[in-house]
Amino acid sequence: MAEIHAYLAGPDVFFPHARETGRQKIAYLKTLGIIGHYPLDNEVPAALLNDPAKASRFIGDANEKMMLDCCRDGRIGLILANMCPFHGPSMDVGTAFEVGFMSALSYRHNVIIIGYTPYRRSFEDRVAGAIHGGWDAITYENGVPRAPDGTMIEAFGGADNLMITSAIARTGGDIFATFEEAAQAGVEAGNRLRGQGTW
């Protein structure tokens, strides 16, 4: 039976107690039969710590390799993405990249993308809320909402940019309020893939 390997994406790595958060999430996944992988498991070599460019390259390469490892050798690759707004109305940009990376892998591998966020306001509502004056400052051109600078506000009612939500939907995932709900959905989605007789 194919193993489910989950990459834990999100801005959690920037939060206080980031390592403990990762340990707790991996322990929870283990109770569900999922093998978890957390970006902070990739230790930056001491020799690179004084060279920001080399250190950042090491981190980026290591995270990509970790995602690749989640779906190699017939594994079911799962990404559990914390989509909470980070430093703005949208999700963490690094997490968005990782969702895109796994989305690309899904065309060649068995990958499921699942998001979670306690913030239930739509993407466009959060964007408007970040603009001085909120919705009162928004104008409409042929039904399209525009910010005061004239740029269009994406308004599809999704939890974030359409490229994120469409990738989640295409791979059979969804967006949930909590990590625990997302993880449980990952098990169910993985079992559906197993039931398709791929292995």
Where are the language model's segments positioned?
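Conserved catalytic or regulatory cores that recognize and/or transform ribose-phosphate-containing ligands
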Residues: 1-199
